[in-house]
Every structure is written in C-alpha cells, then in structure tokens.
A protein has these predicted regions:
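C-terminal structural segment of proteins
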Residues: 1-132
Length: 133
C-alpha cells in the first residue's frame, strides 16, 4: 500500500528536481510500478504538466520524454520504421493495452525491473539515455 501525505504538480524540471531531493518524496508518472511497493511518500511530484510526454524525431534520431507511455512507443510510426519494428515488438506483449496506456518510459527505465522488456530496447548500442539524478 502506498500512502501520500502531500501532492505537488511541478511547474518546471528544476522544481521537480529540487522536490525530489528529499528521500521521502517520489516522482509520479503512470503509477504502475510505484504500486508494487509498500511506501510512505512525503510529497508526490506530478510531472504531467512539463511536456515530457512527446516523441520528437530529429535528423540525429529520437528524443523520447520520460512521460511517454509504452502505448505511444508501440504505435509511433517513425520509431517502428527506424527500428524495423523492434520498439513495437519490445512492448506489444506487455500485459495489455490498458497497462501500456499508463506505464511510462521513465518509470520503466528508472525502476530497472528484471522483467522490463523496455529496458532491453534502450540498451541498443546506438541509443543514449540521459538521466538526471
């Protein structure tokens, strides 16, 4: 069971980062993986208003936001074409569409669960993952 004492919708990445410096505070995304823990959260940090839910295609590659859902990854035509369907295949068998509509790339990478098919596709030699601690 998860208990949340306070909720804050971050207005900037800097604010979210500052809030997340306290050990008891947690970042919220799709909340799929947080439900697997028995935790007390001081402040729940909502990133939904920061525009991190987009996939941008550039000449160099793709910029994938932390709040992009697994379903967005699965259905993105540019990623499918660029990876010859590998991204789509890495997520399409994960539970069901309902879960993929909620689970986020950021949560899937940050949690580092051994069962994460998403983690594997981001380990490809030509991918770069930028994490800010």
């Amino acid at each position: 069971m998860m208990t949340i004492r306070e909720y804050k919708k971050a207005e900037s990445l800097e604010e979210a980062w500052q809030l997340n410096q306290k050990k008891q505070n947690r970042v919220l995304g799709g909340m799929i993986w947080l439900k697997m823990e028995n935790i007390n959260v001081g402040t729940a940090i909502d990133l939904s208003g920061l525009g991190l839910d987009t996939i941008e295609e550039t000449e160099e590659g793709f910029a994938i936001g932390a709040m992009v859902t697994l379903r967005q990854l699965e259905l993105h035509p540019g990623l499918a074409a660029y990876t010859d369907g590998a991204v789509r295949e890495s997520v399409r068998h994960i539970v069901g569409v309902q879960l993929r509509n909620l689970a986020t790339v950021g949560g899937s990478l940050y949690s580092r669960f051994g069962f994460s098919d998403v983690l594997t596709i981001f380990l490809a030699p030509v991918s770069y993952t930028h994490l800010r601690a």
